[in-house]
Amino acid sequence: MKIQSLTKKCMAALVMALAVSSCSEPIADLREVDTFAQAKPVWAEGRETEKNLTLHFREQFNSYFASTAYVKLTASCDYRLKVNGEFVAHGPSVAAHDFYRIDCYDIKPYLKFGTNIVALEVAGYNDDNYYLLNQPSFLQAEVEVNGKVVAATGKDFTAYDLKQRRQDVREFSFQRPYIEHYVLDPAYEEWAVKKDWAEAEPVKLSEQEAKQLLSRHVPYPDYTVHQAEQIADNLYSFKCNSSGFLGVQLQVAEPTSLRLGFDEILSGERVNPGRMGCYAYVTYELQPGTYTLESFEPYTMKFMEVYVDKGSCQVERVYMRDYCGSDVKRATFQCDNEEANELFEAARETHRQNAVDIFMDCPSRERAGWLCDSYFSSRVAFDFSGHTRIEKNFLENFLLPKAFKHIDKGMLPMCYPSDHPNQNHIPNWAMWFVLELEEYLHRSGDRELVDRAKTRVYELVDYFKPFLNEDGLLEKLSRWVFVDWSAANSLVQDVNYPSNMLYA
């Protein structure tokens, strides 16, 4: 008995000693990490410009007494991070051409005693669009436990081309890259959860050119999971329009092909996935078995319909994992008019879905950061959050590039970060950038960013000078002169009075 008691005391002392020795200081602000200790940008050798290629990266490590544990990463185009099979995050936060923002996640809550697996799906689209820039693909990531890097791209992490996602597919819309079409069997997630998994041949990775790195700066998203209700055969409804990752639980009895179609409204009594000029489907080809499937990209919907094109399956659950702004609770409103109360909450819900890392005009068809829209969104953001972090990122993205590809010298893109190979722009949208800068200074006191914008604003003024007529009015502006779908666009030609009022 005395020996057993002594052994227990020794073990307890050893555990305490190990715990104390492994302590490290936590990172003060996960939003402001802007460097890697060891990680290098990597991708499959010679395939960094290949269209619509998804690679699966994994690394396993041992952890027994973790006081701190983080994953730091960035990528082009985007990633999904899981630890021991559990969803952690989607990212990164968008940035200007040739700049990349680092995300940093506390993964301590996901760790187990012993072997742990960090798994990353990374999609490289290399496609011109308004959401995810057409830039060479890469992943740069490292795992830090107790202040020490235990895995880093460039020397650790193994990558696989599992071909679970088809490459030869159409775009979701003109403004967004490729649709999701998967070919899976029930073992499709073993690569992310199985210790010492080696069921596929790894791809050869090569180091890519060094990247210009920035901090994320903005709050991390809200990933709340909520359920849909079945309202008819194969038809499901969420409580309200929702933006995030569409999930389904399925039992598949035989080889089955199915599509999950979605929209924000019903057309008649069913979903019309093409209504908004999108191909609003996620497609799966499945072998018999049990599945919990979740889209890689975020979408917007209230209604979802299941189309079984071949075979049969039983849908057991439909859910949404939100991908929305998390810091929107500062403002409150309550009165004796319930319709007014509902209107306020609808405004909050609309804002949170359109303010993840920049201000977007819509979270569905485009996910684009449009000027003009941002002028009004930024006012609401300050009311709902009490800070200007998202607005700073939005404006800074317009300041970071030395020049904009395919845009006339001095002009600003109508939306950004985005690709504009058709050379289109909205001249009067650039004026809203200047107006927003003034309000941003009043809201934030951030003189440093406004001063950085001086050259860009002066170049914009110089751009407009050749269009001034003898009356000092702008005449025959080039490209798309746009007053947000107003009939004023067509009433008067050459001298557009709404544009001149904005210019004045």
What positions do the PLM features span?
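Structured segments of extracytoplasmic/periplasmic soluble domains
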Residues: 350-353, 397, 401, 443, ...
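Extracellular/oxidizing-compartment recognition motifs
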Residues: 27-364, 373, 387-394, 405-409, ...
